[in-house]
Amino acid sequence: ASGNYSTAMGWSTTASGHFSLATGKFAKASDFASTVIGHYNSSGSSVTDSASSFSTSNTAFVIGNGADVSNKSDAFKVMFNGDTTISNDLTVSGDIVISSDARLKSNIVTLGSTLPKLLQIDGKSYEMKGKQKIGVLAQEIEEVFPELVTKDDNEMLAVNYQGLVPVLINALKEQNVKMKEQETKYMEQEQRLERLERLVANMD
């Protein structure tokens, strides 16, 4: 442990960030006040390699699950700004509840037409980390709904799937309006046909 008031435990661990903690095997905690546990983590290393001051853009907590020095990776990561990354499936037995109170929001604008943009997106079936999955491609989403796509430090894109819900709601409402318009036109045509049939019958 080389950082001020830092602690390193386990095998070949490094705690170079001030007030940091590293425990496990080849775990490295170089961000200020960061905690790293596990094996060969890839996050938690600052540019200076020994952070001495706090920053919300730094890593707060990491669980490393890398195989070796050439294959470092993280199972779980929490940033000081609250951003959290889980590198595999998340199983939840209860509900996932997201804050959505209008009092927490500003510059609220009703979402306009989304159906044309939604039709530009294709659902995909693909393999990811050895598992068969169904979803969308972030690059396609970014072209029509860029606000739903984020990029990490490695330039990898991620999609806010929850943000697609209001998009789907508006698209469904648009489709419903079109169906009602078609239904009205059909009924009008039926009425015209009935009037024409009565007219022909009276002529006979």
Where are these regions (language model features)?
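Periodic small-residue-enriched repeat registers in elongated scaffold domains
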Residues: A1-S87
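C-terminal intramolecular chaperone/autoprocessing and neck/assembly modules of extracellular spikes
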Residues: G82-Q162, A171, Q175-D204
